[in-house]
Amino acid sequence: MPKKDRAQEAPSRDVPRPEEGQTICVVKKMLGGDHLIVLCMDGKERLARIPGKIRKKMWMREGDVVLVGIWDFQPNRCDILYKYGNDEIKRLVNENIISREVIDQLRG
């Protein structure tokens, strides 16, 4: 018996927005060993670390838009919290959280 056709609808989940101590960044360079260099919306380059919880679930590459949590005791370093997909980036642009020009400029 064939399987039933089910509508392929993406679940509409909330897109994480930056809170205090968090910012949106673009991956600039992969360093290896779960470290990357990211260019943030505040204009700073930071050394980012991929925590073990998302290391194997989420693959990163240059040009990806990510949400990072900035370290309190070392503001030039951060942890990757979430990787935005293309549809989520569009939702952030539509909600005026970020502008398309800034993302294009950060991506180079």
UniProtKB/Swiss-Prot annotation:
Belongs to the eIF-1A family. This is Translation initiation factor 1A. One of its GO terms (biological process) is translational initiation. PANTHER family: EIF-1A. SMART domains: eIF1a. Residues 11-85 form the S1-like domain. One of its GO terms (cellular component) is cytoplasm.
